[in-house]
Amino acid sequence: MAHPKRKISKTRRDKRRTHYKATVAQIATCPITGEAHLYHRAYWHEGKMYYRGQVVIDKQTAVA
């Protein structure tokens, strides 16, 4: 199994880790429904799936 030849200092380790950061999710508000959702994602609202302000799927319950 491989082992490091030299000890990595805390400073060097931390400099490498500066690129790993948490990002805030970008949230949009639909102009039609007023629902908050993630950008570039479809979302459900009152039994309908919306994407870019248009109804993609209208979920109708079948009556037997």
Curated annotation (Swiss-Prot):
Keyword 4Fe-4S annotated: no
Record-level GO cellular component terms: large ribosomal subunit
InterPro entries recorded: Ribosomal_bL32, Ribosomal_bL32_bact, Ribosomal_zn-bd
UniProt keyword terms in alphabetical order: Ribonucleoprotein, Ribosomal protein
Molecular-function annotations in GO: structural constituent of ribosome
Organism superkingdom: Bacteria
BP-aspect Gene Ontology terms: translation
Listed HAMAP family: Ribosomal_bL32
Family: Belongs to the bacterial ribosomal protein bL32 family.
Record's protein name: Large ribosomal subunit protein bL32
Organism this protein belongs to: Flavobacterium psychrophilum (strain ATCC 49511 / DSM 21280 / CIP 103535 / JIP02/86)
Gene that encodes it: rpmF
